[in-house]
Amino acid sequence: MNKDEAGGNWKQFKGKVKEQWGKLTDDDMTIIEGKRDQLVGKIQERYGYQKDQAEKEVDSWEKRHDYRW
């Protein structure tokens, strides 16, 4: 998948990310912009999770939505 495809894919899934993690702000979503490590970091920040817990949540979300970064 090239960068343009990944960006388009992110736009499609952005709403689903907000549904899953409602504490993420629009500014957070702009920072994340399809970057998995940024999503994990923002989940840690907003929810007070340890990195491994945030990683597990993202892993689970990826599997449910068949999302590839």
From Swiss-Prot:
Domain of life: Bacteria
Entry-linked InterPro entries: CsbD, UPF0337_stress_rsp, YjbJ, YjbJ_sf
PANTHER family, alphabetized: UPF0337 PROTEIN YJBJ (PTHR34977:SF1)
Family (UniProt): Belongs to the UPF0337 (CsbD) family.
NCBIfam families recorded: PRK10428.1
Protein name: UPF0337 protein YjbJ
Organism: Escherichia coli O6:H1 (strain CFT073 / ATCC 700928 / UPEC)
